[in-house]
């Protein structure tokens, strides 16, 4: 079963309160989502492998460490875009791919309509980013697509999840760790996380 990490940090909790508030403006919501993405990055990267390199300081040569593998951020369009800048600010060397999904009207399952990834997904560490882990369908479909393209080290990064989404993702991809800022109570009858924060995409981009 895949590892589930729900971050417990006062700054993250403070910022989560801001984005849960229905009265928070689009601008503040978007900025805060990025800030939470940056804070989460410390947790999701703490076990990454490093290698020794030699650098020359103004005083003398010394041995330092740098990341061994390329980091690749893959947001699920469109809401996943809101977290990209925060993560990228922490790891500017990270490359960015994109995947877009739509829901098939008959099967109700997500289908990929757009996928563009750096070749580094083959040997790099891939972060699949989506603010909400609700049914788990989109996350599962995105990770399946990445694995079909050769990705081996994949992690899911979200803001809010629920037990239903976590269970599905762990069943479909038991090798994929899940990192969340919060684990909420449940899904309601129309598929929204409760208490959640509403539609993350609409709140990020000011749409209805």
Swiss-Prot record:
GO terms for biological process: UMP salvage; uracil salvage. The lineage of its organism: Bacteria, Bacillati, Mycoplasmatota, Mollicutes, Acholeplasmatales. Belongs to the UPRTase family. InterPro entries: PRibTrfase_dom, PRTase-like, Upp_B, UPRTase/APRTase, Ura_phspho_trans. It comes from the Bacteria. This is Uracil phosphoribosyltransferase. 5-phospho-alpha-D-ribose 1-diphosphate binds at residues 78, 103, 130-138, 199. Pfam families: UPRTase (PF14681). Its cofactor is Mg(2+). GO terms for molecular function: GTP binding; magnesium ion binding; uracil phosphoribosyltransferase activity. It catalyses: UMP + diphosphate = 5-phospho-alpha-D-ribose 1-diphosphate + uracil. Its EC number is 2.4.2.9. Allosterically activated by GTP. Keywords: Allosteric enzyme, Glycosyltransferase, GTP-binding, Magnesium, Nucleotide-binding, Transferase. The gene is upp. It comes from Acholeplasma laidlawii (strain PG-8A). HAMAP family: Upp_B (MF_01218_B). Pathway: Pyrimidine metabolism; UMP biosynthesis via salvage pathway; UMP from uracil: step 1/1. Catalyzes the conversion of uracil and 5-phospho-alpha-D-ribose 1-diphosphate (PRPP) to UMP and diphosphate. Binds 1 Mg(2+) ion per subunit. The magnesium is bound as Mg-PRPP. Uracil binds at residues 193, 198-200.
